[in-house]
Amino acid sequence: IKVCSPISAQAILESGWGESRLAKDYHNYFGLKCGTKWQGKSVNLATWEEYEAGTAMVISDYFRIFDNMEEGVKGYFELLQLPRYQNLKGITEPGRYLETIWADGYATSSVYVQKNMELIEQYQLMKYDENASGRSAQDVLNVMRSWIGYSEANGKFRQIIDLYNSYLPLARGYAVQYTDF
């Protein structure tokens, strides 16, 4: 992987800054579904899907369970080894990475690329792309740890929640409240 910012943005968006039930209880920070080849543990949860642009619906689907954060991040990189994601190799531009992974079927939201790019720009995540050639799952894990668990005391709390709630349809169908933390 030659670009880390879109991966960090995906984790932020998919996990609600590491605070979603899927992230907190099951260490699945990327919203990874089981698919047909998954042999590990799983949990059935409600989720939003957008099969027709602009029309979201709630479905129930099986998501992967990981034992810890490290395994959850490694799970993302293992998913990228599937043949359908091989076209991501060598991409150095965040927008192109996101457009490609979206077109490959990673997400159904018609605004998925836009939401992730807004996170990349607002939080200057491209600084993690410098010299990203050869980055590992551990590098992305280190970035994620620095973003997970914001609290009201650090001044980003309300800004993060407001940004998260501004994206429709809401991930997992839930608008985060300031009092949730």
Located regions from the model:
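Catalytic cores of secreted/periplasmic lytic hydrolases that degrade extracellular macromolecules
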Residues: I1-S133
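N-terminal capping segments
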Residues: N131-F181
